[in-house]
Structures are given as structure tokens and as C-alpha cells.
């Protein structure tokens, strides 16, 4: 896990919140995607928990940098209040993606979708792009660029105290 020095944590948390927060939606977000095992995952299956939906690709260096952060976050929170869904955003065979996810010890569901400018949650202007979905199914935040476990946890904590 990457550790942020305390003197920068408040500043980074503020920047993360400023660039990450989105306005309210009319309806809960929804998608259904297959994982590397061929199992369907519906976003609504995770209602009641925060869902970190991370769009990434195997060829994307910043994506690879944040994988350990997402693994740590998922491991720490999956049985409590939050999960990570990794959505692979490239044309890659299911077997190659499965092997990659095993090599990187990805402990969260690795889903597949076809690349394009948009997703079910909103635009994908670059990779990685991470959306945060509230326990009620509302997309509350988006971050383009890498995230850390601490920044995600801090943002969720801020949302809970609102």
C-alpha cells in the first residue's frame, strides 16, 4: 500500500473530494457484466454497500499501479461496507484476463466490457476511471486517474458524515 505523508493527506483528500464529487442522479445506476469465470454481476446485487467501480486495462501503467491499492481496500472493507468491482476496458480473451488477475492477486470481481467513450455509469475519458456508487445505488463520484485506498476511504467517510 502507498502511504501518504500526514502533512499532505488533508490536501490530497480535499483535491480528491473536489474532483471526485458528482451531482445527484434521478435513478439508481445499474449494469450487468460477466466476470472472468463467466458469472453475471449486477450492480444492484451490491446495494447496501459502497461500490468502487474501477475501469482499467492491462496495458495501462497507472492502472497497474493502483491495483494493490484496490486489493487492499477490497480486502479491508468487503465484509463490512464496501466492495471493489474491476471492469476491464479492453479487447482481451477471458483466459488472458483471468491469468492476469491471478498474477496481480486481484481479490475482487474482475468484470469485462467493450471499450468505448461511455459506460453505464458515465463517460470514460481516460484510464483508469473510477466511479463510486453509494449503498443506495447512486453514482456520487468519479475520478479520472489513479486512486488510493486511503483516498477512497476518506471520501466515503466524508459522505457518511454529511
Protein language model features and the residues they cover:
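Thiol/disulfide oxidoreductase modules built on the thioredoxin-like
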Residues: 99-106, 112-157
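Bacterial N-terminal signal peptides
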Residues: 12-21
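Conserved redox-active cysteine motifs that mediate thiol-disulfide chemistry
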Residues: 55-72
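Boundary at the C-terminal end of the N-terminal hydrophobic targeting segment
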Residues: 23-28
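Conserved segment of the thioredoxin-like fold in thiol-based oxidoreductases
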Residues: 65, 75-114, 127
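A short beta-strand-turn-helix
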Residues: 30-51, 121
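Short pre-active-site segment immediately N-terminal to redox-active cysteine/selenocysteine motifs
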Residues: 49-51, 55-59, 126
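N-terminal secretory signal peptides that target proteins for export/translocation
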Residues: 1-8
Amino acid at each position: 500500500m502507498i502511504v501518504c505523508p500526514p502533512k499532505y493527506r488533508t490536501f490530497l483528500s480535499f483535491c480528491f473530494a473536489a474532483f471526485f464529487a458528482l451531482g445527484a442522479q434521478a435513478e439508481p445506476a445499474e449494469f450487468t457484466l460477466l466476470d472472468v469465470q463467466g458469472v453475471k454481476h449486477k450492480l444492484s446485487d451490491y446495494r447496501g454497500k459502497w461500490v468502487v467501480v474501477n475501469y482499467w486495462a492491462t496495458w495501462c501503467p497507472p492502472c497497474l499501479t493502483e491495483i494493490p491499492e484496490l486489493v487492499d481496500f477490497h480486502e479491508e472493507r468487503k465484509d463490512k461496507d464496501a466492495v471493489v468491482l474491476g471492469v476491464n476496458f479492453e479487447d482481451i480473451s477471458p483466459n488472458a484476463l483471468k491469468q492476469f488477475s491471478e498474477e496481480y492477486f486481484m481479490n475482487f470481481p474482475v468484470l469485462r466490457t467493450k471499450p468505448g467513450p461511455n459506460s453505464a455509469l458515465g463517460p470514460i475519458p481516460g484510464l483508469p476511471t473510477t466511479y463510486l456508487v453509494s449503498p443506495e445505488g447512486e453514482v456520487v463520484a468519479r475520478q479520472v486517474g489513479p486512486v488510493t485506498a486511503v483516498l477512497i476511504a476518506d471520501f466515503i467517510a466524508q459522505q457518511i458524515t454529511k
